[in-house]
Amino acid sequence: MINTFDWFKKWAGYTPDKIALKDAESGTTLTYRQINNASNSISYYLKDKYQLKKGDRIAIIAENDLTQVLLFGAAQKMGIILVPINYRLAHAEVEYLLGDSECSLVLYSEGSYDVHGLKYEATYEPIAPFIHFIDDESPEYEEQVNEEDPIFILYTSGTTGFPKGTLYTHKMLFWNSINTALSLTISSTTKTLNCMPLFHTGGWNVLLTPVLHHGGTIIMFKKFDAEKILRSIVSEKLDLFMGVPTMLKMIAELPEFESTDISFLNYIIVGGESMPTPLIRKYHNKKVPIRQGYGLTEVGPNLTSLHQREAERKQGSIGKPNFYVQVRIVDDNENNLPPNEPGELWISGPMVTPGYWKNDKATANSKSEGWFKTGDVALMDQEGFLFIVDRKKHMYISGGENVYPVEVERVLLQHEAINEAVVFGIPHEKWGECGAALIVKGKEISSEEIRDYCMKNLAKFKVPTEIHFIDSIPKGDTGKIDRKTLKSTFMKERDMA
């Protein structure tokens, strides 16, 4: 039985003793042979102990660690589906995701998430002991895995207020890896680190899976730590590094940054949001090129790349489409628009998701004749460079995390003392953006009580930083809240205060 998508089996045959993974904290290293052996053993363990089979779902609630890559290897071999879940979410949020994905097994890290109190019925097992499978040797696990079989369900916050599970197939991972390698010159000699969380596509699929697909080496960090990251870049002599502007700003503000030589980096990849020109120049002054790009969970995610030589000349651009990515910019009637005319950005290619888990309506609404509708307004200039004019309608990005106001509003409106609520993103010096909530009270309640309530029901990054009470929320003729005008008025009054 042939499984084309078993990457670790292939590399275990080509370069068995090459280091594929290194844990930044403990220094533990894993070769491609060890990963392949462990992935086989885990596959048999999951089948024999839990009767898991192709198509079954496993949730992972954990900080970054090497065991998650071993489970990824098992998923490639078995055809099971991994469901990474943000360990910063509240119990109610996690229960919704577990129920929606119908996971039968939940693996968690004891130090980062307390599963006690979760009402969802499943088998709960600590993830840490899975690392011991590296000492096992098992025969190759055999299963017919096809390109359209899912390997991930990655949840994104939905505009309806409920998260949607984006299906990731083996085909998507393959073509995203090829696109990334062609754009960023990734090969078996590539060495990088990953500090992006593995509950997002950015953690798995911006660099981690493309580098492992091509036989390179990854240094794994549990979480971002500016000082440790800078130290690792130097000590490991990395080829490239990926981070969001907030991370790069924190690194650049370290006292030792100015005296540290990082000119050996081929480039730094920037995602999540646009990088300010002064920050670009800080890295350029250290002879480190900057590669900005654009991506979405539903499409790979790596879609475009701005070559480092254009970083300042085309500042604000997301670059040009990657090799096997097709783009259109369309008007409201789905007609193609000429250069410099803003319209909705549509994407096509083999790295586009087949749809959302158990959500045919959302899947249908997101596509048109094979094109994925990003919901982002963009334009293409005369040279073919793309620019995002506006993000998805109301979403804001706080420290690299996408926050959908309607999700926060849904929680706020469940409180008996709140009659109306509007949330939007406002500038924040450290996190890029944070949330501001305008509240119409039904009963007496303080901003501190609202914040405490949110902390119990939402991830910390979703909790509004500013809470203001108003008498009423203005609405348009159709009864809809005019968020754009409301935010504009709020910002003007805030600036004048």
Language-model segments: residues:
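Conserved pre-ATP/AMP-binding loop-to-beta segment of ANL
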Residues: 16-17, 137-155, 162, 185-191
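Conserved AMP-binding/adenylation subdomain of ANL enzymes
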Residues: 174-191, 199-240, 250, 254
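Gly/Ser/Thr-rich phosphate-binding loop
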Residues: 238-243, 252-313, 326
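Conserved AMP-binding/adenylate-forming
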Residues: 45-89, 402
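ANL superfamily adenylate-forming
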Residues: 111-148, 162
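Conserved ATP/PPi-binding loop(s) of AMP-dependent carboxylate-activating enzymes
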Residues: 304, 320-324, 335-366, 401-403
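AMP-binding/adenylate-forming catalytic core of the ANL superfamily
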Residues: 44, 68, 89, 349, ...
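Conserved AMP-binding A3 loop
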Residues: 29-33, 151-175
